[in-house]
Amino acid sequence: ADTIVAVELDSYPNTDIGDPSYPHIGIDIKSIRSKSTARWNMQTGKVGTAHISYNSVAKRLSAVVSYTGSSSTTVSYDVDLNNVLPEWVRVGLSATTGLYKETNTILSWSFTSKLKTNSIADANSLHFSFNQFSQNPKDLILQSDATTDSDGNLELTKVSSSGDPQGSSVGRALFYAPVHIWEKSAVVAGFDATFTFLIKSPDRDPADGITFFIANTDTSIPSGSGGRLLGLFPDAN
């Protein structure tokens, strides 16, 4: 199975797998059952921003999700990613819809990793930034239903030609280049990721959510990982 660390923007509470009974931001370490969550006042039809950061000195993974003009949601979890993830990983975004649906539109995405060893400063760092997405992106690995549209957006899950979200959809987008996320001799390792998103839904209960995730380089969408499993995990254990 893949080794996954993720920050989930979970729009639909699945209390049967340990979700709180409201939309939430969660930190997932090798399981869909979040280690830490915070209530998320999700706003459909508004552009939101998610910022995720990790620092190997503090050994803390944190996320802040906000909408312009309203308060932000913050969640963090203390974890040493050296003990969780392989040394080389890929970073990605995933989303799903189920019986209920929503658009999972990504407008921009940037990522910077910092890996400083005593001998070489920043030689192993990686930076990318998408302010829009090209029609046939060579620098993204698109999995299942994920596509880029003519407006320069990344649609992680299926939308109709008129832009309406479709149910039972799963999609992921990964940056093509592997990231050197840690090294034994590193003085400091860390990363910052930011993406802007737009969730729209005709349903009273939008579903299911968007994640930023880090995984082994050969990661693929597990069978049966749709809906509440957010395209990341084969089961709810």
From Swiss-Prot:
Intrachain S-S bonds: none
Superkingdom per UniProt: Eukaryota
Post-translational modification: The beta and gamma chains are produced by partial proteolytic processing of the lectin alpha chain by an asparaginyl endopeptidase. Mixture of 60% alpha lectin and 40% of its beta and gamma proteolytic fragments.
A GO molecular function held by the record: D-mannose binding
Residues annotated as signal peptide: none
Positions with a binding annotation for a carbohydrate: Y12, L99, Y100, R228
Pfam family, one: Lectin_legB
Family classification: Belongs to the leguminous lectin family.
Subunit comment: Equilibrium between homodimer and homotetramer. Oligomerization is pH-dependent with homotetramers forming at pH 6.5 and above.
Protein name: Lectin alpha chain
Organism of derivation: Dioclea guianensis
